[in-house]
C-alpha cells in the first residue's frame, strides 16, 4: 500500500481554543491524509472553559483584543458583521463602530470561537478531510500502546476507540482541595455561577491577578452598581441592603494587574534610518547581539526625550535598573 494514501487518525482531547487552532493548522497544511476526532465534554466547540458559562458571566472580559488574537479564518472585526443580531444587542456591540484594539466580553468571544470552529470543519470537508465531533463525551483514560504505535482513548460511557496519534487540548483545570470541606471557601471562582449570591460581610480574595478581577466583577455586580458622578468619574454604589459587604484582596506583592494601553504608533520613535549605523556598531562590539543598555538608551529613552521632555529629564541619567526601581515604587504607591 502506498504510504501516502494511509489515513492517520488523530484524536484531540478537548474541543476548546487549543483544539480550534490545532485543527485549523492541520487542515490548512498540505496534507489531507488525516482524519480528526474531537472529544469535548461540554455541548459546545471552541469556547472552552474561559469563554463559556463554565468560566465567565456577561460582566467578564478577555485579556486580549481582536488585533492580538492569532489568525483564524476570519478576524473578529469581520465576524461581527455576520454575528447574530440578538448576540450583538445583548453585549451592546455595534459592528459599525467596532474597535479591534479594545477587549471583549468573554462570552461574546466564545461565540466567535465556536463560529470559527464551524468554519474550520466546513473547510475540512472541502478538502476531503473527515472530522468527527463527540460532544458531551468525557475522556477518562488514554493508553499509549507503543508496541503498535497506537493510542486507545476511553470515554466515560466505557467506549474505547483506537487512534494513530493523540493531542491533549484540555486547557484549564481547577482542582478542589478545601472547597466543600470548609464552609464558604472556594478554591477558584469558576464556574462564576457559584458566586452569584450575596454577602453582608467582608469577603476575602486571595491574590490580586486577573482571576481576582473576575471575582471582583462578579461580586460587584451582585452587591451594587457603577455610575458616573458629576465630574464624569465612574464610581461604585454599594446597595444599602449589603452595607457590611466589602472585598479584601490579599496579595504577596501588593500589585494589581498592569494597565494595558494602545499606542497609536507601534514604534515610539520613527528615527530608524539615522540610528542604523549605531545599531551595527553596537552589534560588532557584542558578538552580533545588541546590548540591553544600548536598546534602553536608543529605543526607549531617546523616544521619551522626543515625546515627553519633562519626563525624560527625570530619567535622563538613570540606568535600566534604576528606571525599573523608580517605576515600581511609583506603581506600589498607586496600588
Which functions belong to the PLM regions below?
Residues 156-165:
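Core beta-strand elements of the Rossmann-like FAD/NAD(P) dinucleotide-binding domain
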Residues 150-155:
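Generic recognition of long tandem-repeat/solenoid scaffolds
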Residues 120-133, 242-244:
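A short helix-to-beta-strand connector/capping loop
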Residues 7, 12, 17, 21-36, ...:
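Rossmann-like dinucleotide-binding core of oxidoreductases
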Residues 118-124, 144, 218-227:
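Short regulatory "switch" loops immediately downstream of catalytic or recognition motifs
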Amino acid at each position: 500500500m502506498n504510504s501516502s494514501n494511509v489515513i492517520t487518525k488523530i484524536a484531540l482531547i478537548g474541543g476548546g481554543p487549543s483544539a480550534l487552532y490545532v485543527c485549523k493548522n492541520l487542515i490548512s497544511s498540505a496534507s489531507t491524509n488525516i482524519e480528526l476526532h474531537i472529544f469535548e465534554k461540554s455541548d459546545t466547540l471552541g469556547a472552552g472553559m474561559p469563554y463559556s458559562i463554565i468560566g465567565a458571566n456577561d460582566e467578564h472580559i478577555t485579556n486580549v483584543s481582536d488585533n492580538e488574537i492569532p489568525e483564524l479564518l476570519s478576524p473578529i472585526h469581520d465576524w461581527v458583521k455576520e454575528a447574530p443580531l440578538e448576540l450583538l444587542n445583548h453585549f451592546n456591540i455595534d459592528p459599525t463602530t467596532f474597535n479591534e484594539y479594545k477587549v471583549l466580553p468573554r462570552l461574546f468571544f466564545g461565540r466567535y470561537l465556536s463560529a470559527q470552529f464551524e468554519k474550520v470543519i466546513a473547510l475540512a470537508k472541502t478538502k476531503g478531510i473527515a472530522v468527527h465531533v463527540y460532544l458531551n463525551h468525557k475522556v477518562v483514560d488514554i493508553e499509549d500502546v507503543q508496541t503498535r504505535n497506537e493510542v486507545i482513548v476511553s470515554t466515560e460511557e466505557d467506549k474505547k476507540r483506537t487512534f494513530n496519534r493523540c493531542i491533549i487540548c484540555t486547557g484549564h483545570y481547577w482542582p478542589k482541595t478545601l472547597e466543600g470541606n470548609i464552609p464558604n471557601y472556594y478554591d477558584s471562582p469558576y464556574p462564576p455561577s457559584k458566586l452569584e449570591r450575596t454577602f453582608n460581610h467582608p469577603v476575602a480574595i486571595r491574590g490580586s491577578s486577573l482571576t481576582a478581577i473576575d471575582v471582583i466583577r462578579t461580586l460587584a455586580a451582585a452587591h451594587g452598581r457603577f455610575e458616573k458622578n458629576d465630574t464624569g468619574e465612574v464610581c461604585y454604589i454599594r446597595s444599602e441592603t449589603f452595607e457590611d459587604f466589602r472585598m479584601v484582596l490579599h496579595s504577596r506583592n501588593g500589585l494589581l494587574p498592569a494597565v494595558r494601553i494602545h499606542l497609536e504608533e507601534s514604534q515610539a520613535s520613527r528615527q530608524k534610518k539615522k540610528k542604523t549605523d549605531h545599531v551595527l556598531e553596537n552589534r560588532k562590539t557584542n558578538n552580533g547581539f545588541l546590548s540591553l543598555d544600548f536598546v534602553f538608551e536608543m529605543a526607549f529613552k531617546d523616544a521619551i526625550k522626543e515625546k515627553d521632555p519633562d519626563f525624560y529629564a527625570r530619567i535622563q541619567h538613570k540606568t535600566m535598573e534604576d528606571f525599573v526601581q523608580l517605576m515600581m515604587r511609583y506603581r506600589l504607591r498607586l496600588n
